[in-house]
């Protein structure tokens, strides 16, 4: 299926690895132009693969917790391409800031995981109105299930879902669609780092995978990317304000089925 994304310009925050990297790559395969916003330069092999798929794909170094950098990077994107068709808010980290961490640590977690979602939307929306574009917010199943000992991350992910609905309402008259994708267990570099903290990482992986109803396996970054890119496309032209769980039934299906 042609998603009709050729030459559409899409900013992807945290778009150089993991879920964000998969989204950038899928956009390039659809002949869209991904603009990767990331703190650190992407791996050379990733950039080469991206350029093979879409020579106009671009990386911009951006510290998303710096509002001025967000503003300037969006302005640079517009100066380079003359338009903006989509925003994928993706960057963040499950940082383990729980109830014992204190207010300052909690607020810092919101800065890492939530505030830049708003900042990016704030600076992108005027341009998205001009193209009747789309926003996709990458959230997490922790927004609806909790996890324990990660208050900052869960608060951020829950707020992202609320903002998805709020922005969908606020932007409806401008034809800008806003949706959220909600992963659960996805094997990414950050997830591997977390698994490595367990005494027996392989046993922990097997334990988690066994609880996923559909296929007893982890969701892949590509499966998240497929959904996100579809939502960015005209093929999802009457879909807005939705929360799409892409998790093999992990969040909602009866665990007795497993």
From Swiss-Prot:
Residues at the catalytic site: 153 (proton acceptor)
Record: residues binding beta-L-fucose: 94, 140-141, 147, 153, 184-185
Any matching Pfam family: adh_short_C2
Pathway: Carbohydrate degradation; L-fucose degradation
Keyword NADP appears in the UniProt entry: yes
EC number: 1.1.1.435
Molecular function in Gene Ontology: 3-oxoacyl-[acyl-carrier-protein] reductase (NADPH) activity; nucleotide binding
Annotated catalysed reactions: beta-L-fucose + NADP(+) = L-fucono-1,5-lactone + NADPH + H(+); D-arabinose + NADP(+) = D-arabinono-1,5-lactone + NADPH + H(+)
Family matches, as CDD domains: SDR_c
Bilayer-spanning residue ranges: none
Residues binding NADP(+): 17, 19, 39-40, 63-64, 90, 153, 157, 186, 188
Cited InterPro entries: NAD(P)-bd_dom_sf (IPR036291), SDR_fam (IPR002347)
Keyword set, alphabetical order: Carbohydrate metabolism, Fucose metabolism, NADP, Nucleotide-binding, Oxidoreductase
Gene Ontology biological-process entries: fucose catabolic process
Quaternary organization: Homotetramer; dimer of dimers.
The protein's role, per its UniProt record: L-fucose dehydrogenase involved in an L-fucose degradation pathway. Catalyzes the oxidation of L-fucose to L-fucono-1,5-lactone. Can also act on D-arabinose, with lower catalytic efficiency, and has weak activity with L-galactose and 4-deoxy-L-fucose. Shows a preference for NADP(+) over NAD(+).
Family: Belongs to the short-chain dehydrogenases/reductases (SDR) family.
Other observations noted: L-fucono-1,5-lactone is unstable and is rapidly converted nonenzymatically to L-fucono-1,4-lactone.
The name this protein goes by in its record: L-fucose dehydrogenase
